Structure formats: structure tokens, C-alpha cells
Amino acid sequence: MLERQSLAVPVVSTLMLLWVLYRTIAYFRFHHKYKFPNLVPGVPLFGNMLQIPKDTAERRIYLHNLAKKYGEMFTLKVGSNYWIFMNSQRVANELLDKRGARYISREKLPMPGDVASRGKRLVFMPYGNLWKWQRKVIHEVIGPGNRNVFAPQQDIESRALLYQYLTEPDLWNQANARYASSLVMSLVFGRRTKMGDPNIDRIIETNNEIMKMFEPGSSLIDSFPFLAYIPLPRAIQPWRWWGDGVYKESLKNFSEEFEGLAQRQRQGKDVTCFVSEFQRLGRDKTIDYETMVFLGGTLIEAGSDTTRVALNQLVAGAALFPESVERARKDLDLVCGANAERLPNSSDIAKLPYIKAVGKEVLRWNISFPEIAHSLIEDDSFEGHHLPAGTNVIWNSWGVHMDASEYEQPDRFWPERFMNEDLDKPIKGHLAFGAGRRVCPGWVIASNSLHLLIARLLYCFDFHTVPGHPIPVGKPFEIGTEKPYEVKLTPRSQAHAALVKAECAAAAEIE
């Protein structure tokens, strides 16, 4: 027995030395072959993981400061992963657009992508057949060719928001959240929602949990993905307790919406929405139930946050920079009449270029969305840097959108900056919808909805700052559902108040 133990010590020691030698050789070979841009100094094993702030706003500022120090690109090492941050539109356009076929996949995130989604959330899917099929179906149903199919939902939800602004102006933030959730819910599942809708609240809650999983270091298996493949008992995998719970709750919430739609269809109600069109085309016969449920559900998650945050930014920009509102009204009054003759309609937007510019500025100014990395599917070289397949490349959105070298007076809400842009391409000039072949597939409908709402809100309402409650500029706003700042809303005139009451009251009645 003693002899065996005495032999085990040198054997184990030799194996450990061989492993260290192997890892050392692999490390030097890797860094001899590949060259990352401006690798930010970190600590052994963890890299920069412990340096990155957990708070979202603080993290945006931290990344912005690194961009000022290192320039257009820098690299953070988070555990065993390398993240390259793009800090200029030039670099982002070159890599994500011009070389989009190489940067088409998603970073490997075991926690949100595998454990909490089982590979079924489109936003986390790697490049492959399922991702291509789902993108094709979404484009087929809600792409540019069908932009008018869902116009009735956009019209009625914008009218409901106007009426809520008129009757409950202090609840503008909740009204924005209701509008965003109800619009996307009606587009996807054919159901309108009220403030405090219980299933919407549950979906938002699980989506917030997904967003927390993006925080660097929030889950050990995202920083050290190899841990996901070690067959450990579930009892000592705390990430699975969290992720499994989010998946089960998401499946339950999404299934409830599918079952509700099926019941309405059995009752003979004519419901035109993404899922009903999906079924009409027979696409539901080609995938399993859970994948179908998550396809619809993740459209809800993706659409509601973006719309709500954009509306909050519009309110803040209009209150802080009333000159932009006055400029917009010059065009609106020419089209709709200065004395509240009628509401702007979707058909008017083509004659309102400044409204389109406001839409772009809303999606640029001080806005903060989660960064979801693109992942290289093959090695690439760029300006002396050599990047391996699997490298994560992230657009530093808030930092670039608020960078004076990219945008003149970035703290200023100034739609005029986009008047010389191609206003018929809403995704140009900012990256709020993403970029390249991973651009949001619903950007056409989202842009149309935003333009209509901007036109109607600026035509009918005044926005005022509240003394003693300054609106912060130059600091990222959180994506949470709480009221981000104080703003006073009033009708533009008694005539405009009467117009909203007459034209919008019926839309605010939700069953």
C-alpha cells in the first residue's frame, strides 16, 4: 500500500507538469499566431473579468473610457474568452457589414444561450440551419413586403398611447411600457394588453434575468465555458438552478400566449398576427412545439424593451430640446393643419423627412442597449491584427453614439445631424438595430411604428422639464422599467386635446 502511494506522488506530479507544459506551449503558439488589438492588462486566470463593473451604466462609461485610451479597438479577456470592442462606426461597418459573412455567428454563452434557452432563443443562436430558417420565416412574415399588413395594430396602439398621455400624463412611463408591450404582443400573438398585464410582467421579469446573464462574470460557465461540459451533479452546478428556472418560466409564459391565441381562433375571432401567418404558411408543421413557442416569445422580449426605451428617449429629448419639437411641427402643421385638423397617418411619413431624422436621433442619443457579440466563424485579419475563429466582436454602442469624434455635440438631441443621411434607410447612421447579417429582422415594422408615434406625439403634446428634477445627459439610462426621470406632459392646445379625445378614446378601451 505504501509502495503504491509512493509511486502515485511522482506520477501525479509528472502529469501536472506535463499539463502545465502543454498549456504553456499552447499559450505561446496561440499568441504567436494571433494578434489581438490593444489587449487591456488583466490578472492571471480571470483576465479583465474582475475589472468590469457589474452596474450597466458604470460598465458603459468604463468601456467608453477604455475607448478614449486605446482608440478604435481594444480587447478584454474575460475568463478564457476574448472580447474585441469596436469603438468607431468605421470599424463596425468594415467588420460587421462588409465582412458580415465571417462575423455572422454568436458568441458562445452557455448560461443564457444553452441553460436558460436550450438553444431556442434566436438572439443567441449560432450560425446554422435553424438560425437561417428562423430568420427566413421572420422576414417572410414581417419583412418589408408585409409592412402594411400590421398597420392597423400600429395605428390603434399609437392612438391608445395618445389618449393615456392626455388622461394620465403623470404615468407616461407606464404608458410607454404598455404601448411597447401591447404593440409587440398584438403583432406576434394578436392580443392587446393593459398596464399591469400579469403575463407581460412575468415575461419582462424573465427577460430581465436573461439581461443579468450578460453581465461579465455573472455566471462562471460563461467566463469558463469548459465547465458546462464537465458531468458534474446538478447539486453543485448553481448556474443550472438559475438557468433552468428561467427556461421553465419562459416556456410557461410563452405557452400561455400560444394557448390563448388558439382559444381565440377556436372562437372564430379573426386574428392577424405573426403566429397566425406563420401557421397559415404551414411553418408550424416543420418545427417542434417548444422551438415554435420560443420563436414567438423571443420576438416579444426583443421588441418590447427597444420600443419602450426609444420612447423614453423621445420624451427626454423633446423636454430638453424644445427647438427640435418646434422644427418638427413646422412640417407637421403643413401636412395636418396648425389647428389640430387631423392626426398624422402612416401615409404622411414620406412627406415628413424631419420625423425620420428624429427617429434616428432617438435611437442614437444617450441610448443604452445590451451588447450582444458577433462571433467569427473563420480566422480573419484586419489592419495588422490576426483574429482566430470564435473571437467575440462587440459594438461599443453607447460609447460611439456619445463620441464627439463620431457625432458633433453628441450630448445634444439634434435630429438635423441626420438630414443629409439616407432617411429612407432607418438603420443607417446608428446601430440600435444591430448590424450586418444579424440586424434585427423586425426593423422595418419597428421603424414604421416609431415614425408614426413620433409624428403624433410631437403634433399633439408639449414636453417640459420639471424644476428640481434635472434629466441626466451623458450618463447611460438604465433599461429597467422604473421611471427614469421626471417630465411634464401637456396638450399642445385645447384643440389638440379635443382631437385626441375624439380620435383616440375608443382605442384606449381594451377588453
Positions of predicted regions on the chain:
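Conserved cytochrome P450 K-helix E-x-x-R motif and the immediately C-terminal K′/meander segment
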Residues: 50-64, 69-71, 322, 341-383, ...
